[in-house]
Design a protein with these regions (language model features):
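Conserved beta-strand elements of the Class I
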Residues: 75-77, 159, 248-252
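Residue-level signal for inorganic ion chemistry
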Residues: 18, 58, 107, 144, ...
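A transmembrane-helix-recognition feature enriched in membrane-embedded lipid enzymes
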Residues: 1-41, 352, 356, 360
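Acidic beta-strand-to-loop metal/phosphate-binding motif
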Residues: 302-309
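Phosphate/Mg2+-binding loops and adjacent switch elements
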Residues: 80-218, 222
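Walker A (P-loop) phosphate-binding motif
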Residues: 27-93, 198-199, 389
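C-terminal accessory "lid"/substrate-recognition subdomains
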Residues: 2-5, 167-301, 363-389
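Short, flexible loop segments at boundaries between secondary-structure elements
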Residues: 228, 278-282, 323-354
Length: 389
């Protein structure tokens, strides 16, 4: 199984032990009530992880937005990583990546009718979102990347685990990728194994389910990434793009884990040149010149493929050559649940929001049509029971 191939640096284990002491002490303060976790009257759903690197948080938050936005007033609260502003900020049509960060900007661009806000202090952010008249208050708040933010006690705590980097085979920072001990998974109400290959065998599901060793109060789901058709970043001058299987592809990415995207694209294109930057990278003019040069050096026919998150940072970047602009395409990604679990997941989320929303009476019964439109496959959900072994 791919999950047990995680490389860790044993030489750094002493530092990991020291780091673990600090993390465990902090968690103990919360468990003892010395540090307080605050609950709110509004339904709060947290999506996050305990590892460094990408686990697919943004696609899963966007899945929840699509699921809820037609029947509830949805707000997303993020810390706005690498933004140039401070404090609480509610996004509007004039907000930029510099104002709110690339991921909140991406969500506000894709879902302009929902509320997107940023604040490093989530309790303050939720208080701001729920203040004022009732008409402006959200029915549900989605916390982006907040599993470790224990000052808020969400109604549903969703933890994401990358199939290719299972936490049960990992170590604490800096020898491994874990930001918290594996036992922190016990705080999750829902655990989702993300980025699963579509051809997973039944034995793999059983092995992972047993290895995760969840409690009866926890639910385990498996999801995979589904790529949508390419679309141009600059549609006005974009060249017509057909099948890119025989084209030279420059894969431009500034995300935490670009390796899986490269592997997935190799099934659709024969010649791929990866050009990777750090996660949330702000492209400098030197970077743009390098991108122009690398792409100019590729033989035709050719295309540049990038991610939705990188698109937000490239749109208003000066210096891209005309050739790059004509050839720059984004590969959108969505989440799809496996094992016919989508309906089970949807009903659980909608039921929680409906029962706890201020507008629960008005919202009652409206989720039926949404469930039909949620693109789930299969006629019957498959339920997995969990036991400690």
């Amino acid at each position: 199984m791919e999950g047990d191939l995680i490389n860790t640096n044993k030489a750094l284990l002493p530092l990991s032990w020291l780091y673990g002491l600090g993390v465990n002490f902090r968690n103990m303060l919360f468990e003892m009530g010395i540090l307080k976790s605050r609950s709110f009257d509004v339904p709060v759903i947290s999506v996050g992880n305990i590892t460094v690197g990408g686990t697919g948080k943004t696609p899963h938050v966007e899945y929840l937005i699509r699921l809820l936005k037609d029947n509830f007033k949805v707000a997303v609260l993020s810390r706005g990583y690498k933004r140039k502003t401070h404090g609480f900020l509610r996004a509007d049509k004039n907000s930029t990546v510099r104002d709110i960060g690339d991921e909140p900007f991406q969500m506000k661009t894709k879902f302009p009718d929902i509320t997107v806000a940023v604040d490093g202090k989530r309790t303050r952010g939720i208080t701001q979102l729920t203040s004022g008249d009732s008409d402006s208050q959200p029915d549900v708040i989605l916390l982006d990347d907040a599993f470790q933010h224990r000052y808020v006690k969400p109604g549903i705590n969703i933890m994401l685990v990358d199939y290719h980097h299972l936490i049960i085979y990992d170590r604490l920072l800096p020898s491994g990728r874990l930001r918290e001990p594996v036992k922190s998974k016990d705080r999750a109400d829902i655990v989702i194994i993300t980025k699963c290959p579509t051809d997973m065998k039944p034995m793999e599901y059983r092995v992972i389910t047993k290895a995760m060793s969840l409690y009866p109060y926890q639910q385990l789901f498996f999801s995979t990434h589904v790529y949508e058709p390419l679309r141009p970043v600059f549609p006005k001058n974009a060249k017509t793009l057909g099948n890119f299987k025989d084209m030279n592809v420059l894969l431009l990415s500034g995300i935490a884990s670009p390796e899986q995207m490269l592997i997935d694209l190799q099934e659709r294109a024969s010649q791929i040149t990866p050009l990777s930057f750090s996660d949330h990278h702000n492209f400098s003019q030197k970077d743009i010149m390098h991108i122009n040069e690398v792409f100019a050096g590729l033989p035709s026919p050719k295309v540049i493929i990038t991610t939705e998150k990188d698109e937000t940072r490239l749109l208003n970047t000066e210096g891209l050559s005309d050739e790059v602009k004509r050839s720059l395409y984004v590969l959108p990604v969505k989440v799809s649940f496996m094992l016919d679990q989508e309906e089970t997941f949807n009903k659980h989320i909608i039921s929680y929001v409906r029962k706890n929303s201020r507008n629960s009476i008005l919202a009652k019964g409206k989720d039926d049509n949404k469930s039909k439109d949620s693109d789930h496959s299969g006629d019957r959900p498959r339920t997995i029971s969990f036991r400690n072994n």
